[in-house]
Amino acid sequence: MDGYSRVISYRSFLPPRVLAWAGMLLLTGCSTSTNQTIETLGYVFHKENEIVLTSTQLRQLPYASAYIKVGDLPQALVVLAYVNGERLSWMSADGVMFITEHGRLVKTIGLPNDLRYLGYLDQDPLRIARLDKLPSMVWYSVAEWSQKYTSGYPLSAHYRRVGNEVLEVIDKPYTTTIIEESVTASPSEVQWNNYFWIDEHSGQVRKLKQQLGPSLPVIEMTFLKPYSS
């Protein structure tokens, strides 16, 4: 089974944070609310079709979570499994890992052609959280993938605002500015566009549509319950 299919093939695997939380429930006993949460977990991690949870179900989840969609595959749910400083590792039920930093996908583990490395993240315009500065910025980076274009391909990115949208997340509206990132990979000069929905109040990325490299599928990710340290 290829990695793209594995993203939505919900089997018996649970991320470590979920296993730890479930173990705590076994030690402390289950109330009505925790029983409801366990039922939600069973629904999420064994459902084979597109995942769509109600606002109530999402509120019952005790950890950061996000919807993710890879190419034309059905929507899946990922939960926050690891935190390493500003780097957040989101895991699907069968172990595919999507790693973000400041709302950008910077690495994957378990896809057919993983993004292994993305350089110069300290200069990433998404770190700035200043919408008035983004359109005038250019970001130069270097990327490596596991199967093709494996070593140090230069990328350049330009930015512009393309609109505004109010996102409804767990019944709460977030006013966002949509930023288009136009990426060019050298030396092939292959181009593609990424999109980031940035919260006008907090500066957080609430949603992304990001292509991780030439000829790779677009990954759409909507942050439902963001991580807070």
What residues fall within each predicted segment?
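Acidic, serine/threonine-rich low-complexity disordered tracts
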Residues: 31-111, 116-117, 135-229
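Surface-exposed beta-loop interaction hotspot
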Residues: 125-126
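C-terminal motif of bacterial Sec signal peptides marking the signal peptidase cleavage site
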Residues: 26-29
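Bacterial N-terminal signal peptides that target proteins for export
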Residues: 2-20
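C-terminal partner/receptor-binding element of secreted or periplasmic proteins
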Residues: 129-135
